[in-house]
Amino acid sequence: MPTINQLVRKGREKVKKKSKAPALEGNPQKRGVCVRVYTTTPKKPNSALRKVARVRLSNGYEVTCYIPGIGHNLQEHSIVLVRGGRVKDLPGVRYKIIRGALDAAGVKDRKQSRSKYGTKRPKEK
């Protein structure tokens, strides 16, 4: 417990909040180029082939990004928009690719939660 005099001299040190998406450097999104598109397996209780991409961002960082939704058109050299947001069962994946922006097409035949997957409103008949 510091004395009042010690607090006057030094003061309290503010606890610095660590960024959960440091590669974005405080920006909401960053543009990048796919270096490698591949699948990986999730952590223990789950089983699947999760679609991920290694992306070189415009600021020089290289990060692993999750590709959400069913099916995608991404390949090497695709230009993508990356946002923060981790995937709980994929260690080291702290970013997601935004569907429907730049080279990443929206999810086909998506009826619900369309805005999250970059899908246009279906035609009414």
From Swiss-Prot:
Top-rank lineage group of the source organism = Bacteria
User: GO molecular function of the protein, one example?
Assistant: structural constituent of ribosome
Specify the signal sequence span. none
Record field: compositional bias (Basic residues): 9-20, 113-125
Provide the alphabetized UniProt keywords: Methylation, Ribonucleoprotein, Ribosomal protein, RNA-binding, rRNA-binding, tRNA-binding
A single Pfam family, by name? Ribosom_S12_S23
Stored InterPro entries: NA-bd_OB-fold, Ribosomal_uS12, Ribosomal_uS12_bac
Q: What does this protein do?
A: With S4 and S5 plays an important role in translational accuracy. Interacts with and stabilizes bases of the 16S rRNA that are involved in tRNA selection in the A site and with the mRNA backbone. Located at the interface of the 30S and 50S subunits, it traverses the body of the 30S subunit contacting proteins on the other side and probably holding the rRNA structure together. The combined cluster of proteins S8, S12 and S17 appears to hold together the shoulder and platform of the 30S subunit.
How it assembles, according to the record, is:
Part of the 30S ribosomal subunit. Contacts proteins S8 and S17. May interact with IF1 in the 30S initiation complex.
Protein family: Belongs to the universal ribosomal protein uS12 family.
Query: What NCBIfam families has UniProt attached to this entry?
Result: rpsL_bact (TIGR00981)
Q: What name is this protein filed under?
A: Small ribosomal subunit protein uS12
Task: Name the species this protein comes from.
Answer: Persephonella marina (strain DSM 14350 / EX-H1)
